[in-house]
């Protein structure tokens, strides 16, 4: 007896489960590597403290009342960036953001005997933008002042407030916020033109906040009919220190030192530069004229003593309309030697 084969199911066979032919790989993309550099300056304590004595000026006597030897009223602003008051500290201050004055004492040292007449006064004004005193009565009205005969030594201690202030590195700041006032020196009842004594400043100053060195070159411009405008650097020159006419230009340098001066005069014809007054030419100057511009570079030394003759003068030209200058301190070795 034969057996029947089993009937096939009418249901369609199910397809086999297959694993998708896809693989996932982790690929390391070679990114550029860098380093994070952190600067922690300055440390919590002040980075730099300096105790120094500076010669501020040589006092020249006068019959009538005169302030700062006839220089600008705000010439002696109390800020370490001021080269007239801090001739050496100004370069240290250029490396920092802030300063703090801890000690300030003015000393007058006479150079004349009792046979000389006249008086000298030293004043501290907390506002660096105030005008100079106009009478002898106003001298005693200041919070800190001292007056003496020209042959008698004296000193004035200024109270330091230990407040941090910004070092001024240009002329676009509010002077009341960055200066610790100003110093004023008044002479009267004496003889004109006689050097009576020296004024020294004993100071202790601290700096903090190291920064890239600020400009130590002053850039100035004066246009015909205008006043001297400073754009950069320390105040070797102030607006009253320069004059301009259609045929000449003059400069009075009342901060003692040796300077490198480069000037560009816009004019119709050529001229010449001379050094005189309180200054002396060092070495040889170089000059050239072309395309309505007279360009000169000189090295000279100024004694800082008041003079009615310009320290540097450009003359013999015509059509002078603008003078641009760069001036900075230098050494006598920076001069040019012809030949």
Swiss-Prot record:
Belongs to the icosahedral plant coat protein family. Capsid protein self-assembles to form an icosahedral capsid with a T=3 symmetry, about 31-34 nm in diameter, and consisting of 180 capsid proteins. Plays an essential role in virion formation by interacting, via its N-terminal region, with the bipartite viral RNA genome and specifically with the 3' terminus of RNA-1 and the TA element on RNA-2. Also participates in symptom development, viral RNA accumulation and systemic movement within the host. It holds the Pfam family Viral_coat. One of its GO terms (molecular function) is RNA binding. The N-terminal R domain is rich in basic residues and is essential for RNA-binding and virion assembly functions. This is Capsid protein. Its main location: virion. Homomultimer. It is found in: Virion. Residues 1-15 have a biased composition (Basic residues). Residues 208-339 are annotated as: P domain, projecting. The keyword Cytoplasm does not apply. Residues 1-24 are annotated as: Disordered. It comes from Red clover necrotic mosaic virus (RCNMV). The keyword DNA-binding does not apply. SUPFAM superfamilies: Positive stranded ssRNA viruses (SSF88633). Residues 47-207 are annotated as: S domain, virion shell. Keywords: Capsid protein, RNA-binding, T=3 icosahedral capsid protein, Virion. Residues 1-46 are annotated as: R domain, interaction with RNA.
